[in-house]
């Protein structure tokens, strides 16, 4: 709520009391208190009237007092892997927007893929009395998981977590999106398809690689060992991995990357070696960050929606925090993935459809080489 900008310049925040709010809203002080503390039994129309009055008089609820009354801080912790990958700031924005509209503040931290830093962040969030923490890092060591679950307060993990009452898990269906990507490339005529993984110490990276191998096997397509290259989810790693693939005696005709940052690095490496995308090699990413649609060419990618993840994470935390939440007994949330086809994939070079497309492009005066 934007109460701060409504405070008259000659009045200190403390000078506006809960009594002023009650008087303006025409309700009792107890009703204001229940509305401020998001007690679910308060009539929604009445709660809206209270919050309107709060804005009008410029009242700032005392968060410490709220915590004493409700037994909760109304703060959620959110831990992400890093902030240099645009996927995570997009996820943070979606999570915070949802949490704030539902009456929660958010404390945010990034681990830079360090288990020690993750543990330190959790400890600091506990010191701030957060009601629960979403660990959205897509990979966390088992010994650290055990330390965290012993805290016995609501936790949300991605992909896997212990089967305990305070743990809720967001299970991403990596397989469906990657299967769609492989089938899309195979339908175009690609047979030599390579895969650049993420760091294989991460469970999510292993899941994506295994989904790729399974999808290729389902189509009877062979994957030479040299067509699987371990990356690190960065643009620099994408450049290095793509250079490794272009150095092969037989270049794959398509490459699927473990995330969009890797794919952007791969595009850069191909540009430097004058390999045209998609005329000479097709590239597919994973995540569908906002930047993907503005690449040249626009990146075909597997979408893992930040909004879906954030919505599930906030709902899962609230289910663990609020005893009367309608999904309090639920322990798993499933996150879909799907292929978004743009312009970084095409028929393999030298095939009849590619030759026809090339000829048509030349007739239109389009540079296709």
Question: Model segments located where?
Answer:
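Bacterial carbohydrate/catabolite-sensing allosteric modules
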Residues: 1-12, 56, 97-102, 126, ...
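N-terminal helix-turn-helix DNA-binding module of bacterial transcription factors
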Residues: 1-74, 364-369
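Short gly/ser/thr-rich secondary-structure transition/capping motifs
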Residues: 12, 56-62, 116, 136-138, ...
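Short beta-strand segments enriched in small/hydrophobic residues
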Residues: 24, 29-34, 68-84, 94, ...
